């Protein structure tokens, strides 16, 4: 039975996000089908104290040569350039190319260099959206025939914690410049002055923009609780009047489908992968136009029939996505190389 080596080192960090959540859910789904799908799996975890780059490009290839799996899949963009078997790499987005100021010089250089080389050398490149696929092919000159689109799926476990009291709008994700939160806060403040009841909750780690956002909010009720665990995020989404996602760049937009699962209408930027993820189940705005952001939020909140329709469509859209389906599509990519 062929063995697939899966790099799972990002899955079990204390606060996983992005590729770590993807890896954890994919590994769980693959583990449940191991053997019955005709494949065995070797879940690799990083050990020791070697620098990350050394582990990726030296230690991991040694492990692969020792055990000789049929192929290796790295779900985090980082694929060993020298390997004894075919390689599959998942690319979630190229934000480090499109928004370089969001990354330190060292981190940005690492992601750009390793991801470019991995995408060009991999036998298959899995992209989480058609947008990311187009971006990878355009920026790195990757042959489209070597790419496959396999979308993400909702990953948050369902919980029963009580949502916060009162009415609020929610943003869930990192607080970074590319997330376009300043324009959203300004639009929300304008709505508050016009009588909007909802406060604004920005749930996520602050990467240097928090002070500016607080200043833009003035005396209006802006909450920034920082990193929120799965239980807390589930409760926040169930209680929100709407999820607003103003980002200028997303490779998929996990928060969108998480909100849809929980009956929370979504109001999204018409940018990058968000329209692909939201489809006809979301309301949209032009992300650089504060007036349009305010208009879209108000339109959803003031029209109960429209809001109910978005909730219904969102639940239907989210039901199309599951980790069982994502794993099955990923296995089909593996089979192309076996």
Where are these regions (language model features)?
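Carbohydrate transferase catalytic cores enriched for Leloir-type hexosyltransferases
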Residues: 1-338
């Amino acid at each position: 039975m062929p063995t697939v080596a899966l790099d799972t080192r990002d899955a079990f960090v204390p606060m996983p996000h992005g590729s770590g959540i993807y890896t954890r859910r994919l590994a769980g789904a693959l583990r449940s089908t191991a053997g019955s799908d005709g494949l065995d799996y070797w879940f690799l975890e990083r050990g020791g104290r070697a620098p990350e780059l050394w582990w990726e490009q030296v230690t991991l290839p040694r492990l692969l040569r020792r055990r000789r799996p049929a192929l290796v899949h790295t779900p985090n963009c980082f694929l060993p350039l020298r390997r004894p078997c075919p390689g599959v790499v998942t690319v979630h987005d190229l934000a480090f190319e499109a928004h370089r100021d969001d990354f330190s010089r060292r981190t940005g250089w690492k992601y750009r260099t390793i991801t470019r080389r991995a995408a060009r050398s991999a036998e298959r490149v899995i992209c989480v959206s058609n947008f990311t696929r187009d971006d990878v092919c355009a920026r790195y000159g990757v042959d489209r025939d070597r790419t496959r689109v396999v979308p993400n799926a909702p990953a948050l476990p369902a919980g029963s914690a009580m949502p916060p009291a009162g009415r609020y709008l929610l943003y869930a994700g990192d607080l970074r410049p590319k997330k376009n939160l300043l324009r959203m806060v300004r639009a929300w403040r304008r709505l508050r002055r016009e009588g909007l009841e909802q406060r604004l909750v920005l749930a996520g780690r602050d990467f240097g923009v928090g002070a500016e956002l607080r200043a833009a909010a003035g005396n209006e009720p802006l909450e920034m609780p920082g990193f929120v665990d799965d239980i807390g995020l589930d409760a926040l989404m169930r209680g929100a009047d709407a999820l607003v996602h103003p980002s200028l760049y997303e490779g998929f937009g996990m928060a969108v489908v998480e909100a849809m699962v929980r009956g929370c209408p979504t109001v999204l930027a018409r940018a990058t992968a968000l329209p692909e993820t939201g489809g006809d189940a979301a309301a949209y705005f032009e992300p650089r136009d504060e007036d349009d952001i305010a208009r879209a939020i108000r339109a959803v909140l003031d029209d109960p029939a429209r809001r109910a329709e978005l909730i219904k469509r969102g639940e239907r859209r989210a039901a199309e996505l599951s980790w069982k389906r994502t794993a099955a599509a990923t296995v089909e990519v593996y089979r192309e190389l076996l």
